[in-house]
C-alpha cells in the first residue's frame, strides 16, 4: 500500500481465491504513473564499460514460418532497441533467409521445423535470459508441438517465458503448458483473451467488466501474469491489477504487439534479475509488463505524431530510443 498514493479496493462478490483486489490505475502524468515508473527504472541495468556483451540480455524468439516473417523480426529487433545485447530467432528453414535479410544484427537459427528442433534449441537455453514464444509461429501441429516442448524446458531452467500470438493459441488448447508458472507472462489482445477465457471457464466471456475477467483468468491459470491489450492495457497476476491508460493513438497497425512482446522479453529479464527491493515487493512480472506496455504506447504516440494514419510498426520501432528516454531516463 505504501507504494501508491491512491488505491481503490474492489470487493469480489464471486468466490475467487482473493477477496480483495487492489486496483492501481496509471496514466501518464498521474500520481500512479509517477509511483510505478520508478520501480521500472530500478530494474533497468545501468550502461557501464565494465560489462561484457550479453550481460544486459540475451533474448530468444520462438517463431517465424513461411507465412510470417515480420513478427519475429519486430520482436527481436525491439528487444535489441530496448537494450538487450543479443536477439536470437529460432524459426523454420524457409523463414530464415528472409528474416536474416531484414537485419544483420539478429542471430537466426533455421531449426524450428527440423526433426530435432527441440534438442537444437535446448542447447541455447542456458545462454538465454528470456524466451518469447509465438511471434510468427503459425499453427502447424509440428511447430506448436515443438513450441510446447521448448516452453516446458524453459520452465525447468526458470527462464521467463512471454507468450503471444499463436503461442496463445497453443495455451488455449493446452493450458497446462504454462499454468502456474510464475515467470510466465501472456499478452493477449481481446480476441485471444476471449479464446483463453472460454477455454478455461467453459462459458461465454462477460465483456462488461474486463478487469474482473482478466483477474479471473489469471487465477484460473495459477496466478499467471496477463497483459490484456486494448483501449487501456490491463495487467494482472490475479492478486493485483494495473491499468496502463497512457496516451497512444487511434492507429492500430499490425506488428505493434510484437514490439510489446519483444521489449517485454528484455524488461522481464531485468525485473527478475534485479535485487528484491528494486520492485518494492511488487511482482517482477507486473513491473516488467507495465514497463513494456508504457513503452509501446509512448512509441505509438510519438510515431503517430510524425506519420499520422501512415504509421507502421517500423515507425514505432524507430521511436524506441526517445520513448525509452522520456519514460525511464528523464
Curated annotation (Swiss-Prot):
PROSITE patterns: YJEF_C_1, YJEF_C_3. Signal peptide: none annotated. Its cofactor is Mg(2+). GO terms for molecular function: ATP binding; ATP-dependent NAD(P)H-hydrate dehydratase activity. Its EC number is 4.2.1.93. ATP binds at residues 229-233, 248-257. Transmembrane segments: none annotated. The keyword ATP-binding applies. It comes from the Eukaryota. PANTHER family: ATP-DEPENDENT (S)-NAD(P)H-HYDRATE DEHYDRATASE, ATP-DEPENDENT (S)-NAD(P)H-HYDRATE DEHYDRATASE FAMILY MEMBER. NCBIfam families: yjeF_cterm. This is ATP-dependent (S)-NAD(P)H-hydrate dehydratase. It comes from Danio rerio.
